[in-house]
């Protein structure tokens, strides 16, 4: 019988760095049950740390730590070694290497990544921009966008806009519908800022049927019919050609993967 995988994330900040890495690793295994990731954030003293480590020991878990402060990191490492708890320190090997290379000492400030600096406020502004100009609510926003995503319905325009906004990109998106004229503003911006999104008819039909079902509508609606989908995709390709923009196939790609392709294309022009 397969043993459950319980992973304790122990961090003196949010702990999301460790979570991303753990998900990347566990995705490589065909587990019967998803790994049980238990995140303990903002651990800033030995008492809270010991309580979490004792819990990990009782659960026969794996400890993944991102403790910036050396005393806490060393305490966790020693405890795990003494109690035969698998322990991965994601920060200190790299921290030591950077210190050795630069001659500088780490600030050991767990909140340093989350300072309310200009980068933070730029990200908030980008998120607000993505919300304001989602689904081409106001075509004037296309002029000021860093990236404009164009595609038929259900090609991940909105989630990609949100994801890229969290990386400080100002993103607007335009739905392509054969019956609705393309906004003039789309032809007034450099085509290297425009990314066309498309997919296969089969994948689009599948996604649209799921969407219709989720909102209680008939899955056999024209919205998910083969004829309508082929018409829309053809219209999409014609539009991409007119715009002279790069095109990405989004089928079977995670949002993160598509976003990485988009940023690679956009930055290649600068």
Swiss-Prot record:
First-level EC class: transferase
Keyword annotations of the record: Kinase, Nucleotide-binding, Serine/threonine-protein kinase, Transferase
Keyword Transferase: yes
Residues binding ADP: 151-158
GO MF terms, alphabetically ordered: ADP binding; ATP binding; phosphotransferase activity, phosphate group as acceptor; protein serine/threonine kinase activity
Similarity-based family: Belongs to the pyruvate, phosphate/water dikinase regulatory protein family. PDRP subfamily.
HAMAP family registered for this protein in UniProt: PDRP (MF_00921)
Protein role: Bifunctional serine/threonine kinase and phosphorylase involved in the regulation of the pyruvate, phosphate dikinase (PPDK) by catalyzing its phosphorylation/dephosphorylation.
PANTHER family from the UniProt entry: PYRUVATE, PHOSPHATE DIKINASE REGULATORY PROTEIN 1, CHLOROPLASTIC (PTHR31756:SF3)
Protein name: Putative pyruvate, phosphate dikinase regulatory protein 2
């Amino acid at each position: 019988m397969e043993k459950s995988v319980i992973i304790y994330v122990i961090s003196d900040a949010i702990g999301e760095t460790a979570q991303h890495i753990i998900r990347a690793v566990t995705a490589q295994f065909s587990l019967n049950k998803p790994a049980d990731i238990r995140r303990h954030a903002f651990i800033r003293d030995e008492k809270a740390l010991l309580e979490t480590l004792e819990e990990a020991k009782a659960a026969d878990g794996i400890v993944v730590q991102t403790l910036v402060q050396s005393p806490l990191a060393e305490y966790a490492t020693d405890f795990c070694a003494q109690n035969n708890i698998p322990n991965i320190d994601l920060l200190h090997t790299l921290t030591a290497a950077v210190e050795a290379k630069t001659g500088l000492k780490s600030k050991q400030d767990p909140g340093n990544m989350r300072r309310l600096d200009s980068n933070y406020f730029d990200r908030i502004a980008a998120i607000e921009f993505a919300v304001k100009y989602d689904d081409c609510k106001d075509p004037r926003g296309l002029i000021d966008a860093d990236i404009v995503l164009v595609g038929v319905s259900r090609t991940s325009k909105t989630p990609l806009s949100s994801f890229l906004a969290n990386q400080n990109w100002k993103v607007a998106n335009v739905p392509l519908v054969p019956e609705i004229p393309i906004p003039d503003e789309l032809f007034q911006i450099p085509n290297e800022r425009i990314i066309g999104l498309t997919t296969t008819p089969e994948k689009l039909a599948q996604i649209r049927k799921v969407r219709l079902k989720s909102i209680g509508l008939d899955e056999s609606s024209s919205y998910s019919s083969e004829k309508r989908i082929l018409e829309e995709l053809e219209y999409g390709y014609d539009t991409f050609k007119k715009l002279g923009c790069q095109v990405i196939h989004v089928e079977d790609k995670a949002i993160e993967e598509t976003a990485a392709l988009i940023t690679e294309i956009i930055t290649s022009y600068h």
